[in-house]
Amino acid sequence: MSTDLPPLSVLDLSLIVEGGSAGEALRNTLDLARHCEALGYRRYWVAEHHNMDGVASSATAVLVGQIAAVTSTIRVGSGGVMLPNHAPLVVAEQFGTLATLYPGRIDLGLGRAPGTDRLTMRALRRHLDTAGEEDEFPRNVVELQAYLDDAEPDQPVRAIPGVGTKVPIWLLGSSLFSAQLAAYLGLPFAFASHFAPDLLDQALEIYRATYRPSERWPKPHAMVGLNVICAPTDDEAAMLFTSVQQRFLGMHRGRRGPLPRPVTPAEMEAMWSPAEKAGVMRMLSCAAAGSPATVRRQLQALRQRTGADEFIVAAGIHDHAARKRSYELLAAA
């Protein structure tokens, strides 16, 4: 991998493609994880989404375990577990079990978004009154940290497995609140600029300026999320990128479904209005698409702008072989 870029990691949503199935998406995730491990990527993270026709990564801890089982060196983790959907003790037991089975390889990224709609939130038994969520989430993070740390004398409730594993916790988010909390707790921070980039620069500035050193993380450590489509030529990458553009256009219109097949750039232009295009491209402002040389220049500019310690890369490509090739070309860029 290029020495003038930060370490690269993978964010895989296990996207269900148009004409495909959830089973195919999960099998492709396992195959891509093996491929990216061989290419030298640092981490392989999967997300938590519920009741979405186009996303198969709902049982995050299960998927992390499956990926860890078919790989041997790459770090595997959640990007992330939506903590308000779960009891901290349960998450500690799940990831403590994973860390016990795969020591030194498990990451625990935490977010506070629902990852779904309100009806599904109710089905998940998540509290629908979010008025106090900004108070509850920090308490839950601290509680989870305590379960994974060494036990206190006479501690009445412990995570077994989990206690003493000290699974690295990351805070994920796209808000200034998340940046401030990560800084206050002395945790690494992953900004979700792959879909919500508006506050990226301000969040990183606040995170670094207010960071309180911790034993594990004496300095702030920032990861920036990107959409990257790499192909042999700029023209091919532009066509592959239309799948991502169509997906975000659907989100812009309030519709979510399988990842669409790519279209020509001219066909893409006919799909959206100027206002829709502006909105989608704003959401995709932290994206790179092109040949290896083009992508490298774009990532160098993002590194210079953000000072990112790591990039985590999503590749919403309809064809699995082309997706694997994109990560291959990126690793060599």
Place the predicted regions along the sequence by residue.
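N-terminal beta1-alpha1-beta2 module of alpha/beta enzyme domains
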Residues: M1-I74
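An alpha-helical appendage that flanks or caps ligand/catalytic pockets
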Residues: S2-D4, R122, L128-A159, L199-A308
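Flexible, glycine-rich active-site loops centered on histidine and acidic residues
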Residues: P7-A22, P84-D149, F189, P197
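Conserved, mostly hydrophobic/aromatic
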Residues: L8, C36, G40, E48, ...
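Active-site mouth loops of central-metabolism enzymes
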Residues: D12-R27, V81-P88, V163-G173, A231, ...
